[in-house]
């Protein structure tokens, strides 16, 4: 299977404690995911930290993968916790991918998670999450937990291998 991995490129999105940036940590997580997927014989393509969202989506579409997986950590008020996985709309391959990943991720997270959600109107009517809307391949965008919550940031840092394995299994 051909898989496009797209870790966050948000270099200014800082987490709590020792977390550092979302870009650094999600690229670190994606490094682990990539190694695991290659062990299963999958062909992996991936964005680079210097790419914009539009460039990453264009690169994904150029490689024509079977699936596109965006890997992020979330931010809110500093109090929220839990994983959430987005697909563009319910009813298609993107939803199946998102649910498969979520079902495995939910097994390793220490809190009540936030489920699988549609992203077609994420930023308002007709304003979707870019990576779920404009990739040609079925796409899922994962938010593994909240990096602006001290416990969430710590959990991500201490459980990279478990999180990666859950994503790969999904």
Describe the function of each predicted region.
Residues 1-2, 37-43, 63-68, 108-112, ...:
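Loop/turn elements at helix/coil->beta-strand transitions in domains of secreted/extracellular proteins
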Residues 43-50, 111-119:
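Surface-exposed patches in mature extracellular/periplasmic domains of secreted proteins
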Residues 34, 57, 102, 129, ...:
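Short glycine-/small-residue-rich flexible loop motifs, especially phosphate/cofactor-binding loops
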Residues 28-38, 95-110, 152-170:
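Long, well-ordered alpha-helical scaffolding segments within enzyme catalytic domains
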Residues 4-6, 11-13, 63, 68-77, ...:
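Active-site-adjacent mobile loop/cap segments within catalytic or ligand-binding domains
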Residues 1-57, 63:
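Active-site histidine-acidic residue metal-binding/catalytic motifs
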Residues 12-21, 75-104, 108:
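A short, glycine/acidic-enriched catalytic loop
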Residues 53-59, 63, 67-70, 77-88, ...:
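N-terminal catalytic cores of peptidoglycan-degrading enzymes
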